[in-house]
């Protein structure tokens, strides 16, 4: 059984986060305007978790674990690289664009910011990504590989995401939810039953 120490959530008003909101996120975390949009959305949920709980980047146990879950991941960066492959000769494509688009990069950015050294995972998929991510968190807590684990779910706005939503209704709009989970029963029980989207998961566990 898992318990929730803190939670945060952020979402766009019309499927996308406002530019001013993203600017505030970048300012809070010292991010460049060139930072991948997915990372900015991801950190937006972390900023809300900080604001709601009074925690900050120095509050985490250094052995804490991390899971970043997403249905599409940093699809904007992946698509940018694919577009360059189509538009330019292979030797003119920026390798750095692809290097920064791998699905593990957002998790790496969070571990650097929080200076946590526990197990870190990236989980991606559609129908059972959310369930798999939470089961992975529970397994790590039960095994004692980390005293607490930060689970962040995020989606960025994209043409691909819009197309997916037409055929897969549970697909989330541009949003992110963050949960700091523990096996310590002094905190409220983490509720997951019958939940298929980030916002519902957040509202079920906010106190």
Locations of the language-model features?
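Conserved "HGTGT" condensation-loop signature of ketosynthase/thiolase-family condensing enzymes
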Residues: 1-131, 139-145, 151-207
């Amino acid at each position: 059984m898992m318990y929730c120490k803190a939670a945060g959530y952020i979402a766009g008003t019309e499927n996308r986060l406002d530019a001013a909101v993203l600017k505030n996120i970048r300012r809070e975390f010292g991010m460049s305007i060139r930072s991948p949009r997915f990372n900015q959305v991801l950190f937006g949920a972390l900023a809300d978790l900080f604001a709601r709980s009074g925690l900050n980047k120095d509050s985490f146990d250094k052995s804490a674990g991390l899971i970043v879950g997403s249905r599409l991941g940093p699809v904007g960066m992946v698509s940018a690289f694919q577009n360059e492959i189509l538009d330019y000769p292979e030797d003119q494509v920026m390798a750095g664009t692809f290097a920064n688009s791998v699905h593990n990069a957002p998790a790496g950015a969070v571990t650097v910011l929080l200076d946590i050294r526990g197990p870190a995972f990236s989980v991606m998929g559609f129908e059972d990504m959310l369930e798999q991510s939470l089961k992975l968190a529970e397994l790590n807590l039960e095994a004692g590989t980390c005293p607490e684990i930060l689970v962040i779910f995020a989606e960025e706005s994209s043409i691909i995401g819009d197309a997916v939503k037409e055929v897969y209704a549970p697909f989330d709009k541009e949003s992110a939810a963050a949960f700091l989970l523990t096996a310590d029963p002094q905190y409220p029980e983490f509720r997951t039953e019958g939940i298929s989207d980030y916002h519902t998961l957040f509202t079920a566990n906010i106190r």
